[in-house]
């Protein structure tokens, strides 16, 4: 079914399912890697990924990058603006060049003028001119003889109109100029113009009209524009006169003329195939320098001169290169001169002056040089900062085990049995009384719960113990008493009664605690008492040896005085134990029904194998107590004693041992910080909870006294 469903599913669904499966597998792998697999807290579990945090070095690197990029970007923008400014200064000031031959003919003051005759014929153009001429009388020659005529002196004011060139078919003939109106002045005789005809010129000229009777006919003049020599409307110059060649002065018939001024048109004239035109060297104008008062007429260092003509004198200016106009007041772009003669200019003429150009080039060069220097400094600073950042990152990678605490350390150390350092936690809690007794009989029980720092040695008596990590009482006691004691899993810590006091420090040990007198009903004798020896790794060694006890019974209860030798000694003091006699003042017997608060010594890794050999009454029994962590065996010889007395002695020994251990552990804890330790002590007094260090060490006597005073104050506060 599943295979069929898979086959029936579309490919998109299959791919989606495969993708989801892959994602699930990846997520499971990631979770296993993060948690260390199923055994997340095991020894071989992988460490959780370190939390990513924003490093200051990374941020600083980014800031340095932007600090270097932004000035470079601004510098390039400034460079572009500088180049644009240079282009605007150099190219923007140069006007666009327009050739003069493409300018409209009606424009004013745009074409340059020439004060000398051209060296070549003008271009073939037909020009219509309006002239005012004075003709001299001519005498016609008879019989076809050639006649000569005097040159005409013509003063013209010209306006040129450009037309398309006109050519005669079949031969080279210059374009003719036909005067539209001719006025004869001071004519003494009828003015006649001989017309020479030739077979070659049999056709009439364009625009010619038949002669009107009574009007003089003018000779056909060479057809080249006179306006080419005087095109400026402001220039009043005389046009050059010319004479016809002898080939053109052939005999012609003339018509009658009248003395009145009439409009004439040139007749059809014939001439040989080849003809030439000669210019006259005579001129009617005179060039004179301007007077001193007229020197300011020409601007921009132009040269002023006066032209005298028949109509009067006229002032003109010869402008310097780069200027034009009537008074040289118009600036001519220098591109004209560059285009006309580019070999004489090297590009510096684009500027108004060479100094300005040099200043601008210098300023732009300084800007570019400054930008390059700033870029170099930024690059050097960037690489230096990058190197320093790498060094800082390498220093940060050095492990700092003393400053970091791992959350996984406690679980890992709890499961590893070979680790020396471990966290020992002291848990205090109160237990409700089983039977209604007085306040003096209330007990506080506490237990050490913590990881074992050392391997355990199997004990044959482990099966009879109720709790694994606690020692059992001596097997000498009765089953009723043992059942009343072994139901607890922690030792009892009894607050001192109003009559109980802590004695002063006698040597390195505490004095015996005083127990209040409580009447007891009956006693049950028992054999032997346990004697224990603490391991040498802890900061205290306890040797307990009891002397033979004398049993005394009374009607009200059991009262006895015993001498007990107890020594509590720091390991750094001496290696051999010594004993101090302690006077047992008041020992109180407990009944089997009220023996529910007998403390059990904690086993902070302490397991002992006790082999007891009970003997007969009045005979000493030998008990061999072997430490589970040391191979030495303590041989203790004790007499046959009462079980109640043994219980009382054991209670006292255990109380002193626990108090000494608590004092030393608390002292080691407070050595790091006294103030913090005092706060923790108050919290432990109120909440019955305290945390002990990994491996406690012995401290100085001054610290021990300080801790002792705090303990006394706390006990007195609890008693009140």
UniProtKB/Swiss-Prot annotation:
Residues 286-329 form the EGF-like domain. Residues 34-44 have a biased composition (Gly residues). Residues 1-360 are extracellular. Residues 382-720 are cytoplasmic. Gene3D superfamilies: Laminin. InterPro entries: EGF-like_dom, Neuregulin. Proteolytic cleavage close to the plasma membrane on the external face leads to the release of the soluble growth factor form. The keyword Ribonucleoprotein does not apply. Residues 149-163 have a biased composition (Polar residues). Residues 28-48, 119-223, 246-280, 451-481 are annotated as: Disordered. Highly expressed in most regions of the brain with the exception of corpus callosum. Expressed at lower level in testis. Not detected in heart, placenta, lung, liver, skeletal muscle, kidney, pancreas, spleen, thymus, prostate, ovary, small intestine, colon and peripheral blood leukocytes. GO terms for molecular function: chemorepellent activity; growth factor activity; receptor ligand activity; receptor tyrosine kinase binding; transmembrane receptor protein tyrosine kinase activator activity. GO terms for cellular component: extracellular region; extracellular space; glutamatergic synapse; plasma membrane. Residues 127-148, 187-205, 250-271 have a biased composition (Low complexity). The chain crosses the membrane at residues 361-381. Disulfide bonds join 290-304, 298-317, 319-328. Keywords: Cell membrane, Disulfide bond, EGF-like domain, Glycoprotein, Growth factor, Membrane, Secreted, Transmembrane, Transmembrane helix. Belongs to the neuregulin family. Interacts with ERBB4. This is Pro-neuregulin-3, membrane-bound isoform. It comes from Homo sapiens. The lineage of its organism: Eukaryota, Metazoa, Chordata, Craniata, Vertebrata.
